[in-house]
Every structure is written in C-alpha cells, then in structure tokens.
C-alpha cells in the first residue's frame, strides 16, 4: 500500500511540476516570443537545474505543444460543463455562438496560440505540432457533436471550422479586428449558424 501511495504521490508531483513549467514558459514566450526563447530562459524562469528541467521537457516545442493541448482540453471541458449546467441543447445556433466567443476571446492563451500560428510557415517542427493539435481538435468536435447528428460530418467539415476560427483569431490579434468583429458579432454568428444548419440538412437527407 505504501509503495502504491508513494508512486501516486510521485506521479502527482511530476504532473504539478510540469504544470509549473508550462505556466512559467507561457510568460517567457509572451515576453520574448517563441522563436527567441531557449531552454535556458525556462530554466531561469522556473529556478530548475538543467537536469531538473530536461527530466520533464526536452525542448521548447514540447512545452508549447502541452500548453496548446491543455488549452484545448480546458475549453472543451468548459463548453461541456456550460451545456450541462445550463441544461442547453446543442444546436447550430448555440455552437455558432461558442465559435464566435472563442474567436473574440482576449487572453494570454489566445496571444500565444496566434504566435504559434505565425511561426508555422518557417518551422517544420511546429508544423508537425499543429497537425497533431488539429487532429485532437477535430476529435473534440466529434465528441461534442455526437448527439447532434445521426451521422457525423466529415473531418473536412470540422477542419473548415478550425480554419475559420484560426483566421478569426489571427485577424483579431494581428489586424486589430476584434473591436470591429464585436460590433458585427450578430452577423458573424449568423454566418456560422447558417453553415451548420445546412450541414445538418444534408445529414437529415442521408438518414
């Protein structure tokens, strides 16, 4: 029993330490930019030794990937909890509202995510991370939509929505379009709602 308990405590300690590293790294990334950050910067921010840091993460790419995944999971949990707590029924209207709220969000995670997107063109390692993140996002969409469709739409449908969200996020952060988008939130929401309403019609026709 003590051996098992010790293993669990050690495991939890490692998970907590990795979370601390991610939180510290996020601040460094936002301050210096991802491409300008090296592991020594993370060492200084966390106070860990080289061995201590590399025991948990081998590169800034690994840290960034976990930050992105953690953000995706947290948002999914928040959405699912919101639907459950409010007794909401998932519909094109509700989902379009969630999509637009995500696009208009203004927080450190969004800033880091857009920084990540901007680096993709010049960095093959980050491209590989993006492919993984996109696959996980599509899977999260499928789980969320499993009760809405008789037959789930193709991956291309969800990929289209991810591309729309990414385009909107980059417009808000890089082109300073957030205020303009907020003023036109009603129309943006209607655009997404129309798209998913049509996708559902095709689903009904197949049934």
Regions found by a protein language model. Give the residues of each.
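N-terminal intrinsically disordered/low-complexity leader segments
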Residues: 1-16, 203-207
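Helix-turn-helix
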Residues: 7-9, 20, 24-62, 66
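Residues in soluble alpha-helical coiled-coils and helical-bundle/repeat scaffolds
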Residues: 58-62, 66, 87, 104, ...
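Hydrophobic alpha-helical connector segments
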Residues: 66, 80-107, 154-162, 185, ...
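Short, basic, alpha-helical segments at the C-terminal edge of helix-turn-helix-like DNA-binding modules
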Residues: 69-75
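Amphipathic alpha-helical segments used for helix-helix packing
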Residues: 91, 104-128, 174-178
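Short alpha-helical scaffolding segments that buttress acidic/His motifs in well-ordered protein cores
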Residues: 99, 113-117, 165-169
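Hydrophobic/aromatic-rich alpha-helical bundle segments in the mid-to-C-terminal region
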Residues: 127-131, 135, 147-207
């Amino acid at each position: 029993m003590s051996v098992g308990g010790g293993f669990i405590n050690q495991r939890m300690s490692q998970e907590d330490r990795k979370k601390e590293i991610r939180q510290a790294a996020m601040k460094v990334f936002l301050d210096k930019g991802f491409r300008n950050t090296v592991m020594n910067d993370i060492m200084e921010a966390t106070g860990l030794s080289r061995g201590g840091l590399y025991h948990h993460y081998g590169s800034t790419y690994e840290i960034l990937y976990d930050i992105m995944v953690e953000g995706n999971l947290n948002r999914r949990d928040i959405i699912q909890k919101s639907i459950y707590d409010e007794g909401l029924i998932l519909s094109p209207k509700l989902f379009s509202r969630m999509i637009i709220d995500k696009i208009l969000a203004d927080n450190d995670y969004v800033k880091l995510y857009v920084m990540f997107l901007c680096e993709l063109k010049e960095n093959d390692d980050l491209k590989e991370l993006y492919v993984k993140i996109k696959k996980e996002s599509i899977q999260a969409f499928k789980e969320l939509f499993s009760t809405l469709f008789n037959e789930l739409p193709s991956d291309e449908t969800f990929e289209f929505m991810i591309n729309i969200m990414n385009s909107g996020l980059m417009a808000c952060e890089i082109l300073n379009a957030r205020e303009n988008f907020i003023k036109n939130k009603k129309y943006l929401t209607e655009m997404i709602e129309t798209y998913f309403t049509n996708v559902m019609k095709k689903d009904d026709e197949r049934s």
